[in-house]
Amino acid sequence: ADSVIGEGGQGYAVLERTIDEGIMAVGSEAVGCMEKLYKETVEYCRQREQFGQAIGKFQVLQHRMVDMFMEHEQSKSLMFMAAMRMDEGYGPEAQKAISAFKVQIGKSGKFVGQNAVQLHGGMGMTEELSIGHYFKRLTIIDTLFGNADFHLKRFGAL
C-alpha cells in the first residue's frame, strides 16, 4: 500500500486524462502538418506549369485546394474548442470535444495529405519534398490514442 501513487481505483481516470492531453498535443501537431501541406501545395500549384499556364489556374484544382483549406480550418476550430473545454475543467464536455477533434484530424489529415501528394504528382512522395513526410506523420497520428471508431463510440457514451 505504501507504493501506490494516488488513490486506489483511480488509475484509469488519470490514464484517460493523460491520453486526452496526448491527443491534444499530437492533434495540434496534425493541424500544423495540414497547414504546411496546404501552403506548400498552393505554392507548388502557382509555380508548376502545364499547357502554358500555372496548374493553380485550373478551376478543378482550385476547388481541391479550397477543400483542403476547409478541412484544415475545421480541424483547427475543433482544436481550439477542445483546448477551451480543457481549460474550463476536465470532464465529459472536454472529453467529447477531444474525441470530436481526434475524429476530425483523422478525416482531415487523410484528405489533405492525399490531395497534397496527388497535386504534387510523382514528386509528392519523394524524399526531396517534405510532402510525403507530413502525410506519413498524419497517417501515424490518426492511429495514435484510438481510431475514429473508438472516439465516435466514446463521444456517444459521454
Predicted segments, located by residue:
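Alpha-helical interface subdomain recognition
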Residues: 4, 8-158
